[in-house]
Amino acid sequence: MSIFFDDKILQNLPKKVKVVVGIPSYNNAETISFVSKTAAEGIVEYFDSDGIIVNADGGSKDGTKEVFMKTDTKSVPKIAYDYIGLPGKGSAMLSVIELAKNLDAEAIVFLDSDLKSVRPWWIERLTGPIMKGLSDYVTPYYVRHKYDGTITNQVCYPLVSSLFGQAIRQPIGGDFGVGKNMIDVYLKAASSVAKTEVARFGIDIWMTINAILNSNKKVYQAALGAKVHDPKDPGADLSPMFKQVVGTLFDIIVDSASKWKDIGSIEEAPIYGEIPQIAVEPININIENLKMQLLEGLKNEESKILANDHLGFIMEKKKVPLQIWVDILFNALIEYSKNKDKKLVESLVPLYFGRVADFAELTKDMNEVEAEKVIKDQINLFANKKDELIEKL
């Protein structure tokens, strides 16, 4: 009996396929056709049509499933269904993993439903290391605008790299390759996370860190070029995502401390394929809005406590410089480990806005390459706090 979908959908499916392409969606009627058509071209070209495209939908009101089913996917079969469980990306992706297990698939490719830059060769890049026996899990490696992926840049990338010892540039990138071994690992844990934030936006970080901890092969990064999608203004609409992603990340860090505390060095996760040289689309960032949200949020007592000795400086400058951000984040982790209070993660949000404001001002005259160096150099400051964190957890 499946947890995340109605077993009736299995009746019309093939008994076995080599690859499953999963597209989680919610109100993505405008973009899903392009993603599924491109995925089909990739399956035809690189898997000789031996695959299926799966649209796991969250009850879209704009006809997403219907648009998907009308799309010409050549000789590649497809299925669309409403997943079961908490509404969220995680429930959708776990339903695809369950389905892939039923179809004895050798690999899953996950693609975001709002992608505008996906190409057929992405299917090969995200599965190549798996099919060649090099890896059980492949993350995307994109060329991104310096203001795209702020939760990744300021929290997930430096924390995962410094604590878990693998520098994975896009641990929550959304477009992944998953091999058989990890399918089994995820399904073993699926019922225990079905009612948590993993069922929402916590899924990507949960999958990535589980792959680091539970696979005896390296996590690979697939060079995919630019990620062009419906970008989000950090100050406007990332607050729920921040709480779900960072809450999940904190849970995993606390629960798996015995596994990561002995990891000493940081290795760059290998990149598969040549990195295409592509110009990225500009993204607008409203720095004044971020500063306003920082000051507004600092009226909250918990946020003030997290800012601690730095409160006066932060209020005056209306931003959170890197060293202060690292101190705040690690102190929050230590505090969180005591009783896993989700309010604490929520209290980080305004300070995160202040961190993004500082980064945006610092890099405003930099090109993408220069800003990328700033992001990568942050890891050293995070790594310097690791011993202190181990002592106090």
From Swiss-Prot:
It holds the Pfam family Glycos_transf_2. The keyword Glycosyltransferase applies. One of its GO terms (molecular function) is glycosyltransferase activity. The keyword Transmembrane helix does not apply. InterPro entries: Glyco_trans_2-like, Glycosyltransferase_2, Nucleotide-diphossugar_trans. Its cofactor is Mg(2+). Optimum pH is 7.0 (at 60 degrees Celsius). It catalyses: ADP-alpha-D-glucose + (R)-glycerate = (2R)-2-O-(alpha-D-glucopyranosyl)-glycerate + ADP + H(+). Keywords: Glycosyltransferase, Magnesium, Transferase. Optimum temperature is 70-75 degrees Celsius. Inhibited by EDTA and Zn(2+). It is an enzyme of class 2 (transferase). Its EC number is 2.4.1.268. Homotetramer in solution. Belongs to the glycosyltransferase 2 family. Involved in the biosynthesis of the compatible solute mannosylglucosylglycerate through a nonphosphorylating pathway. Catalyzes the synthesis of glucosylglycerate (GG) from ADP-glucose and D-glycerate. Can also use UDP-glucose, with lower efficiency. This is Glucosylglycerate synthase.
